[in-house]
Amino acid sequence: MRRHKKLYTLLTVLVVTFTMFLQFSCSSEGATRLSETNIVMTAGTNKKLKLRQAKGAVKWSSSNKNIVSVNEKGRIYALKGGTAYIKARTKKKTYKCKVVVVGFNKEKLTLSKKKKFTLKVRNSKARKWYSGNKKIATVTSKGVVKAKKSGKTTIACITRTGRKIKCKVYVPKLEN
């Protein structure tokens, strides 16, 4: 009986020691991952994306460079409305981040006097429309822009998510 007690005690000490050794010898670093995997941005803005715990070089790329571009340091630039994926590639694995850019179907608009164009919001719904100068161009609640007289102005829209997006409007002088 006494022999069994010593054996159990010895076994318990060995298990506890082994468990402590495992805890302290393991790395405390987390797994490699992107700082974000889903991002919603407004056209014209930028944001830094990070690949955490990455070892070695990281190669960044965009699935659609017309919507979102990315530089070699992981800074992403929202160019126009749409959806694209940013990829961060290491030697071992590729990581993806979905980027949704809220914007208009046109970022700049040139309209002749009395002409109309319908601006459409991509990846959101319009809540309220504004014209920077109603003497140059007006906008309806449906996003229809009408050129009034020559000049430059900005048409803005507040989306349902609270984002403000803008379109520059130019109405040229008509030469007779």
What are these language model-derived features?
Residues T12-Q23:
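Bacterial N-terminal signal peptides
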Residues R2-H4, Y8, Q23-N176:
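Extracytoplasmic soluble-region selector
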